[in-house]
From Swiss-Prot:
Phosphothreonine carried by residues: T114
Post-translational modification: Phosphorylated. Phosphorylation is enhanced upon serum stimulation.
Location of region: Disordered: 1-115
Name of the protein in question: Eukaryotic translation initiation factor 3 subunit J-B
Compositionally biased intervals (Basic and acidic residues): 67-111
Organism in which the protein naturally occurs: Mus musculus (Mouse)
Subunit structure, interactors included: Component of the eukaryotic translation initiation factor 3 (eIF-3) complex, which is composed of 13 subunits: EIF3A, EIF3B, EIF3C, EIF3D, EIF3E, EIF3F, EIF3G, EIF3H, EIF3I, EIF3J, EIF3K, EIF3L and EIF3M. The eIF-3 complex appears to include 3 stable modules: module A is composed of EIF3A, EIF3B, EIF3G and EIF3I; module B is composed of EIF3F, EIF3H, and EIF3M; and module C is composed of EIF3C, EIF3D, EIF3E, EIF3K and EIF3L. EIF3C of module C binds EIF3B of module A and EIF3H of module B, thereby linking the three modules. EIF3J is a labile subunit that binds to the eIF-3 complex via EIF3B.
UniProt keyword Cytoplasm, yes or no: yes
Chain segments annotated as coiled-coil in the UniProt record: 75-140
Lineage: Eukaryota, Metazoa, Chordata, Craniata, Vertebrata
């Protein structure tokens, strides 16, 4: 009996040890880390993985923000380069304008020019300055080299050629004060008429002949008017004397009245 009681006590003690072992196994789900603590501060296994994923999302957001901040810097640098190019062109253009202006104000002394040549030179320099200003405006505002005026025209109808002729006339006649204007027109008319037929040449010749006759009539009339100014017509002597005496007749007729009674 005593032996049976001892065996029962030993079995009960074994069960107690087994239960204690099961009790200590409850710490297994908690992951230990170096230093005696748990990962993430007493968190259950699996919680730290969620936190790691969240940290990665934040990293992605930070990278996107950095890329967004870099792009404006690239755009600003490109704009800065364009602005520097524009300023450089403006400086070059301004230098050219100053040189042209200096030549306009101070003509070359070593070369003696006639008034006509001086006028032609000034017109040429003025044209260069206008072209320079136009080119600067185009470069500044990014305008294409669009052609205007005579160069832009391609006449095909009668009205087109009429408008084309007006533009040519305005362009050419601005140099009519030049000493070489007449010889220039002579050569120009001859050159542009070379390819014409005889009938067309006759029409142009007749038109110029009529123009020449009209100019001759105007010249004769102008000379006749100049001659008439030096001749006093009939009765002019009496009228002239009367006007001279009127300057001295201050009293109700005066010398003028006496002169008329005498006559």
């Amino acid at each position: 009996m005593a032996a049976a009681a001892a065996a029962a006590a030993a079995a009960a003690a074994g069960d107690s040890d087994s239960w204690d072992a099961d009790t200590f196994s409850m710490e297994d789900p908690v992951r230990k880390v170096a230093g005696g603590g748990t990962a993430g501060g007493d968190r259950w296994e699996g919680e730290d993985e969620d936190e790691d994923v969240k940290d990665n999302w934040d990293d992605d957001d930070d990278e996107n923000k950095e890329e967004a901040e870099v792009k404006p810097e690239v755009k600003i640098s490109e704009k800065k380069k364009i602005a520097e190019k524009i300023k450089e062109k403006e400086r070059q253009q301004k230098k050219r304008q100053e040189e042209i202006k200096k030549r306009l104000e101070e003509p070359e002394e070593s070369k003696v020019l006639t008034p006509e040549e001086q006028l032609a030179d000034k017109l040429r320099l003025k044209k260069l300055q206008e072209e320079s200003d136009l080119e600067l405006a185009k470069e500044t505002f990014g305008v294409n080299n669009t052609v205007y005026g005579i160069d832009a025209m391609n006449p095909s109808s009668r009205d087109d050629f009429t408008e084309f002729g007006k533009l040519l006339k305005d362009k050419i006649t601005q140099y009519e004060k030049s000493l070489y204007y007449a010889s220039f027109l002579e050569a120009l008319v001859r050159d542009v008429c070379i390819s014409l037929e005889i009938d067309d040449l006759k029409k142009i010749t007749n038109s110029l002949t009529v123009l020449c006759s009209e100019k001759q009539k105007q010249e004769k009339q102008s000379k006749a008017k100049k001659k008439k100014k030096g001749v006093v017509p009939g009765g002019g002597l009496k009228a002239t004397m009367k006007d001279d005496l009127a300057d001295y007749g201050g009293y109700e007729g005066g010398y003028v009245q006496d002169y008329e009674d005498f006559m």
